């Protein structure tokens, strides 16, 4: 399957792609993971889908949207700082123009082939993060993610470090962690970017 990666701001993302992105998030987070989120007509959106947001997403050759990230600057409101700050403990929330937050990572398992335990869509989505970082002078990403995604990141050899008290926290029914992911040569090599 041939995958194309797209990069758009909240203002520039084509409406049809944005709707597909919200539907993928609904499928992954509401249906598959059973998270209790605000949804509307089979789409998931939240208070962080704002003008400052940037979206990276993958489409297969028939135009089906199969993966996405949301990226927010840490110089404004973002999920780790403003919703899940308990993951930071006494640590100050990152706030720097070269650090961005990753959220709403989703891959459509129905349209992604596995290559050595990691789907081609997942690998390309992680490669796109490196290219995005290079383009926008991003030194690192922070993210609130599940312990299972952290395990995937480590299995891929991606450098990362837990933030805050470095413990797993239960957010709803999801075992979650806060991570710092540097955009460095080790990251580039781990994803073959």
UniProtKB/Swiss-Prot annotation:
GO terms for biological process: lactone biosynthetic process; quorum sensing; signal transduction. The keyword Transferase applies. Keywords: Autoinducer synthesis, Quorum sensing, S-adenosyl-L-methionine, Transferase. Disulfide bonds: none annotated. Its EC number is 2.3.1.184. It catalyses: a fatty acyl-[ACP] + S-adenosyl-L-methionine = an N-acyl-L-homoserine lactone + S-methyl-5'-thioadenosine + holo-[ACP] + H(+). Signal peptide: none annotated. It is an enzyme of class 2 (transferase). The keyword Phosphoprotein does not apply. Gene3D superfamilies: 3.40.630.30. One of its GO terms (molecular function) is N-acyl homoserine lactone synthase activity. It comes from the Bacteria. Required for the synthesis of N-(3-oxodecanoyl)-L-homoserine lactone (ODHL), an autoinducer molecule which binds to VanR. Belongs to the autoinducer synthase family. This is Acyl-homoserine-lactone synthase. The gene is vanI.
